[in-house]
């Protein structure tokens, strides 16, 4: 152990300090077991590394937990599932001579270190805070050589965010329960993200498509060997109407064409900066199809394994070690010509984050061990980092202007050729929008000024203006970053939360057929035809739900500050100022609360004539009763009649794809034709209806979902019978074994294989055991073993213990 540290520094004083420390008992506490495992490899037997499994305490879940009168003092508690762990850490800390708090280096990590210090009742004289933005031997040893105190400014910045968000959530949610519907909740940053999605949806619905004609021509030009080759050119302007486009083609019939001007200029393309959290989330979504949450989970694993630097950062800076490593790797693989070392400047302030971009810890490692998904993400990070230190791509762009006799219009032909690929050899950046994609490079044939050109087909194609695209998770992150809303640590949770709360849903939209006109001038004849195309198809886009739209409109009206982009961005800046020690966190809380709380009180006192979000569609033919849409207890509903009528109102659930903002009176009335009875099967009635989860068949109190291919208005009794039988078959296959003497225990077949379910909890069955052979005693033994293992083996999802 001693010689292990003596390699670190020639400085005798440092050696003596480290030697003294190494003789003592050292306890290192980190957040995750994976991180602990990696660090343990570097520190040797004199150091014990334990994990806190994230935060060991938090604000009380079901209480406000903030004493506004006492300077916003928070009330923290240790969750029940962390108590045993905290006791273990207390015992270990008591026995240790030095405790090293090695949680992550951002605000969240600093807060974890502070909570550990407080809860474990550590003493300043034997507590050291160490930080590093990569888990490598040199980084860990350097951190141990340079410990510091807990930075209370960073802790206060994190605490301020947590408390402000708790105030907003706890005070706004009851307003939503009373005014919109029960069980809703509101979040500060999430509400702004929902607003962006709602506004984009309205822009799309309000968008008026305009048509215009794009004119392209094919010219036949002799190549270097005299062979005629095709050169494409485009008219410099769009033509508004079909009549004008036809007149233009007619004018071209007798016209002559000539090269008026040729310009050739060099073009340089510079590589993008290394990854920050948001650019990694965007590129992983575009190139690999990962969700924002998936990217962060994989990046965390890569970081904890020591493969990449810290994954929550808004810095594009690279250390000298990284640039040197990149240079060596580039020379080895591609030669000196491909090297161009660069220093990128970080534009966002964000003083709380790690001070380096996301990069591989060792640039010589072109690949790493891990799952296929981890390997792909690592490869993306490696390529982006290497590319950032590579030479510009050198291109040559040639533009030829072609005149038309008797017209002031000109055609333009553009050719581009890569002279030196530079960083493009390794990496090309992707785009959210297809329009941003660049055309493939192509050369123009040799041309001379004044050269007469022979034309092939000249085509006028009707094209349409494009509505704004819906957000993807990645483009929403980009927008939030542009607006200065949120920070690297908040993008992924924000996007997950708005979907979990069902304010936003990720989905696909089928395209619609559209006709467009094409006129072709060829062999002195104009051919006029209509073609069909599919337009507007979208995949994995974010759509606002009706509840999300109603909540957004309500908050925008009564709490404009919370929904204001500039206000939300200014709060982020205030958190940065707290982190830098420029301002007291309590004064920011007070300024916010003094304005916010009265508006909550005032809103609760307002009495409205209509329910929030209600929209009157018209009257029911024959009865004259009001037909409306509103948010009901379980989501959006169509209602015929009002509570004032003698008869009770009738309700119908909307179909998937219908929205409160766009549903028509006719579509609403159609919904009341359901449920409809199809007939009888096995002596019981079979009916079809629409519920909050879509259309269903109901038979003998059993609901069966309708597949997308079947329309509830057209389904036959025979088709319904088939669905009932298929559901029964699946149920039979799901139940493997039951025990009469213990009715709460059952062996089931799930989507991930067989498992035991008992008293609301699920337990794994080892792969080498045949589920059918298990006795009740064997099942109880497996349950006991897994319960004893505690939090280390508890998994989120199917095998999570239900509270």
Task: Give the ranges of each region predicted by the language model.
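Short glycine-centered, acidic/aromatic-flanked micro-motifs in structured strand/loop junctions
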Residues: 103-105, 282-284, 312
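A conserved hydrophobic secondary-structure block that centers on an alpha-helix together
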Residues: 281-283, 287-291
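Positively charged, polyanion-binding regions of nucleic-acid-associated proteins
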Residues: 254-270, 282, 457-466
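Flexible beta-alpha connector loops of hexameric P-loop NTPases
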Residues: 75-79, 287, 483
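Intrinsically disordered, low-complexity regulatory segments
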Residues: 2-5, 9-163, 171-172, 236, ...
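Basic, low-complexity terminal or inter-domain segments flanking catalytic cores
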Residues: 24-27, 38, 47, 173, ...
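Phosphate-backbone binding and catalysis cores of DNA-processing enzymes
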Residues: 29, 41, 88-266, 356-409, ...
């Amino acid at each position: 152990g001693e010689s292990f540290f003596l390699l670190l520094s020639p400085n005798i004083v440092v050696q003596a300090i480290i030697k003294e420390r190494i003789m003592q008992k050292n306890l290192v506490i980190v957040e995750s077991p994976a991180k602990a495992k990696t660090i343990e490899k570097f520190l040797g037997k004199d150091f014990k590394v334990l994990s806190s499994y994230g935060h060991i305490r938090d604000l009380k879940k079901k209480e406000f937990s903030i004493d506004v009168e006492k300077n916003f003092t928070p009330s923290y508690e240790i969750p029940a599932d962390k108590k045993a762990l905290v006791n273990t850490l207390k015992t270990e800390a008591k026995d240790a001579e030095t405790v090293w708090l090695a949680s992550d280096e951002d605000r969240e990590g600093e807060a974890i270190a502070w909570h550990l210090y407080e809860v474990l009742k550590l003493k300043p004289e034997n507590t050291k805070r160490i930080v590093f933005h990569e888990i490598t031997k040199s980084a860990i040893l350097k951190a141990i050589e340079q410990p510091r105190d807990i930075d209370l400014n960073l802790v206060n910045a994190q605490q301020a965010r947590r408390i402000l968000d708790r105030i907003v959530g706890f005070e706004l949610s009851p307003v939503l329960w009373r005014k919109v519907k029960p069980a809703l909740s509101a979040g500060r940053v999430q509400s702004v993200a929902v607003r962006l999605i709602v506004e984009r949806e309205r822009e799309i619905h309000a968008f008026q498509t305009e048509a215009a004609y794009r004119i392209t021509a094919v010219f036949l030009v002799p190549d270097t060997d005299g062979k005629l080759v095709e050169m494409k050119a485009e008219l410099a302007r769009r033509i508004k109407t079909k009549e004008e486009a036809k007149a233009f083609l007619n004018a071209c019939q007798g016209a002559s064409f000539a090269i008026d001007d040729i310009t050739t200029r060099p073009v340089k393309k510079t590589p993008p900066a290394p990854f920050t959290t948001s650019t990694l989330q965007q590129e992983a979504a575009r190139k690999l199809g990962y969700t924002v949450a998936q990217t962060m989970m994989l990046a965390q694993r890569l970081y904890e394994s020591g493969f990449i630097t810290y994954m929550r950062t808004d810095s594009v800076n690279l250390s000298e070690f990284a640039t040197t490593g990149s240079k060596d790797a580039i020379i080895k693989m591609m030669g000196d010509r491909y090297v161009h070392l660069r220093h990128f400047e970080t534009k966002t302030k964000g003083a709380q984050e790690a001070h380096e971009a996301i990069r591989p810890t060792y640039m010589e490692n072109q690949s790493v061990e891990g799952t296929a998904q981890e390997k792909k993400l690592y490869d993306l990070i490696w390529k982006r980092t290497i590319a950032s230190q590579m030479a510009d791509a050198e291109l040559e762009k040639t533009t030829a202007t072609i005149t038309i006799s008797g017209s002031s219009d000109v055609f333009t032909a553009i050719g581009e050729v890569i002279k030196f690929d530079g960083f493009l050899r390794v990496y090309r950046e992707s785009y959210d929008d297809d329009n941003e994609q660049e055309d493939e490079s192509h050369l123009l044939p040799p041309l001379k000024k004044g050269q007469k050109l022979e034309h092939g087909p000249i085509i006028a194609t009707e094209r349409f203006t494009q509505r704004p695209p819906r957000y993807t998770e990645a483009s929403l992150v980009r927008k939030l970053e542009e607006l200065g809303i949120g920070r690297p640590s908040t993008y992924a949770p924000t996007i997950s939360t708005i979907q979990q709360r069902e304010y936003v849903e990720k989905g696909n939209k089928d395209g619609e057929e559209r006709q467009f006109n094409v006129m072709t001038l060829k062999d002195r004849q104009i051919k006029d035809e209509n073609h069909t195309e599919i337009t507007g198809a979208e995949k994995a886009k974010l759509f606002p739900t009706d509840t999300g739209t109603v909540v957004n409109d309500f908050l925008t009206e009564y709490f404009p500050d919370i929904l204001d982009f500039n206000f939300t961005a200014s709060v982020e800046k205030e958190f940065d100022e707290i982190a830098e020690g420029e301002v007291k966190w309590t004064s920011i809380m007070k300024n916010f609360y003094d304005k916010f709380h009265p508006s909550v009180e005032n809103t609760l006192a307002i009495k409205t004539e209509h329910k929030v979000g209600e929209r009157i569609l018209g009257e029911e033919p024959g009865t004259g009763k009001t037909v409306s849409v509103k948010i009901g207890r379980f989501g959006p509903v169509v209602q015929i009649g009002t509570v004032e009528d003698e008869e009770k109102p009738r309700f119908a659930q909307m179909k998937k794809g219908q929205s409160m903002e766009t549903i028509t009176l006719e579509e609403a009335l159609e919904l009341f034709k359901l449920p409809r009875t199809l007939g009888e099967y096995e002596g019981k009635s079979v009916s079809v209806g629409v519920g909050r989860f879509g259309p269903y068949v109901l038979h003998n109190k059993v609901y069966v979902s309708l597949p997308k291919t079947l329309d509830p208005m057209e389904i036959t009794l025979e088709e319904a019978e088939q669905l009932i039988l298929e559901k029964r078959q699946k149920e039979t296959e799901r139940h493997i074994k039951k025990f009469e003497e213990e009715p709460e225990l059952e062996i089931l077949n799930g989507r991930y294989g067989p498992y035991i379910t008992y008293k609301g909890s699920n337990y794994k069955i080892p792969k080498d055991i045949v589920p059918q052979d298990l006795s009740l005693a064997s099942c109880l033994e497996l349950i006991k073993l897994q319960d004893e293992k505690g939090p280390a083996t508890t998994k989120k999802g199917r095998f999570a213990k239900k509270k």
